[in-house]
Amino acid sequence: MVEAKNGSLCGAGAPDPGRAEPPHAADHTRQITQRQVRGAGGMKSVGQDSLGVQRTLSVDGKEYGYFSLAAAAEKLGDIARLPVSLKVLLENILRYEDGSSTTVKDAEAIVAWLETASSTQEVPFRPARILMQDFTGVPGVVDLAAMRDGIVRLGGEPDRVNPLVPVDLVIDHSVMVDVSGTKDSLERNVEIEFERNGERYTFLRWGQSAFDNFRVVPPGTGICHQVNLEYLGQCVWTADTGGKTWAYPDTLFGTDSHTTMVNGVGILGWGVGGIEAEAAMLGQPIAMLIPDVIGFRLTGTLPEGATATDLVLTVTQMLRKRGVVGKFVEFFGPALDNLPVADRATIGNMAPEYGATCGFFPVDRVAMEFLRLTGRDEHRIKLVEAYAKAQGLWRETSTPDPVFTDMLELDLSTVVPSLAGPKRPQDRVALSDAAAAFKTELTKSLGVPANDVGTRAAVAGRNFEIGHGDVVIAAITSCTNTSNPNVLVAAGLVARKARAKGLTAKPWVKTSLAPGSQVVTEYLNASGLSADLDALGFQTVGYGCTTCIGNSGPLDEEIADAIEDNKLVAVSVLSGNRNFEGRISPNVRANYLASPPLVVAYALLGTMTQDITTEPLGTGSDGKPVYLRDVWPTNAEIAEVISKCLSREQFLKRYGEVFKGPKQWQALQVETGTGTYRWNDGSTYVKNPPYFDGITMEPKPIGDITGARILAVLADNITTDHISPAGSIKKSSPAGAYLLERQVSAADFNSYGARRGNHEIMMRGTFANIRIKNEMVPGVEGGMTRLVPGNAQMPIYDAAMHYQQQGIPLVVFAGKEYGMGSSRDWAAKGTMLLGVRAVVVESFERIHRSNLVGMGVLPLTFKDGATRQSLGITGDEVIDILGIADLRAGMDLSLVIHRADGKTDTVPVKCRVDTADEVNYYKHGGILHYVLRGMAKAA
């Protein structure tokens, strides 16, 4: 029985969302240390409920308190047609309303959004929890440890620095495809992973024991977003406080941009920079502009042969064209009645690629089926449904359409098999056009002279040649697709049919399978498809991000040499979500996103230059050509395998050991009982960053930037990969030189991502992407610049250190969509540590702009159509930025350009410090300084 009734909260207390375990995780409580459980929760002495909206919900005889949106509507006005995502924000405000940091006016601003379907108001938001991965998590824990040192300097106690909301860190970013195509690939890659990362992992285990509310999902378990979707996420969370159990929406910030994957099951969350996440976990409300909400109406059903991957690439192309940066996208329409959560999660996952803050699907019957399949507790499922219905968050076919800022519509029956590439995820191309489009790109954007397109090169010691367009990496990878049984089973069936016909992968293709969850192995084994994938070289290489984030591992040396010696444009085909240039492999210049079954098909074909829809994949054992149509499974074949081989029990089994980890994890020894971390000066992985050196209780006054030199002039679409690469470290780079000086061999360099706990390496890696092009040094790729005056060409890091020694501040100029891609806080941290005081561009991607402010770097945008080109910026100028002393959110500042010929121009620029809170962060030198001083004063 489910019923809602009025109720009230006795006393002045308010909900305190403690560390609520996922409902099917009771058996793991013993694995969580007492320290992690003690002091859990984030809402302290707030929630005064000025509007009187507390109510009680009864589910199977158990009562839950909640903050009723229906009751709020009686005081604030009708909210029935608010987008569901904004209703979640409204509930958050009601629950935290304390009359100061969060007020009734904030709630009124959400309701007022309905008047124009837009707003210029900012409101505070506090997520229920934080999700981290290890590349961002290690520097996050480093920062927390450094803050403990900092608060001691200010006279406080180290235990004042603790996460106040639950934090889950999933180790998924470090495994690399060192070994592939063998039966023991998984075991050998795990061994190598621990050899490389034992120091980092020991540090994380220290953090797990030292900090409250901090859990670690060990390596070899899965990808954070898939673990979040299948296990950590609850849709509705509960907490026991003040003698009552409270229910509230599951919301989160993630330190990875693809946190939005969990939007597919009705959980509102998005990626933020590690800096912002650290502030949120330390109890700070995060101010956000009430977003525009774009409604995306879905109708029809996917046709035979089209996959969820094809759907999301189509959605990404449409939304990029429309322009949704900084906006919520909310999906609705009749197609949702039969659109599985796996497909929804694929669409939600790629919100960063289409530019939105999130890609949200409301809770409905389909979501409940997913919760049941994945092993959530039956009472929790009933609670989710009852709560969603009581709050108007539940979607039915008959639910009236919400009010949206703007709308798009897609008939799923029009979706066709597709790829996206060769450099951007929004560059979708129909599969039938892919070969022709690639040949055009070869000469257009990839720089191959027309008379060299047919070049073939011998591979030493092998009996084959390779040429432009040959596929050298075929990777089934990424939570985007490995969370989706439909496309993984399809890949297995393609492998089965190809194997039966005697086809094999081309010998120059490095093949791999890296599921985002161990459940994938369960159903592939149960169906017998693992054997078919293994036969084509798609053995499981690890449970982690691997190729999707650039951890593709080395190609065979002879193949890599043939590519580099002959300047070949080699290709990767991967079931990932990003394909930026230089991301996947240093030997690969063209990267195509594809569904898992197409990844298998391209491994068979071996090239992008042939039309895979009309030309044979190869010759079968009977001597006849085998075409894509011969091996492609029907929807009915896929559905039959899933119905027989995917079960709730598989999720319960695998997630029953989610905190266990491999034997190497269990063997790690850590020092416990220390309030501050004992830094090892000789460590090349974990170092105490200088952020809080010399910190005082009061910040110094801010002022104008004068006499600045230009460190780099960059083009459009500069990604956080360009600014702070995650991939391999070159011996010849400043970071490589640093490691060699410390007796680290090149074989043990690991990646920039794995070294993010060491600021010395990350500073040297800033702007060090092998494909970045600084317009100050035309024709040169890599992190180079000119030292001005004098024009000496040198690595960006070396130039920055020269300027720092002279006390000269630095500025970076760039074009549109600066900072697109991953929510990589080191792209801002490294920028700051190089001495860059301001970044002047045409437009920013959302997360990176926020991160720059969080590190005390001024983000500025040109006005009135001005660009670096129209202003003639060459890098020889001296720059002043005036008006900073009177900084206000969104104000104009003056950019003064002193040219080499003695002329001076002054132009207005918009200060993208967007909120009053951000102004405070900037005045303090960054968000962590602001939080630390607040903690010290409160002690």
What are these regions (language model features)?
Residues 29-33:
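Intrinsic disorder/low-complexity segments
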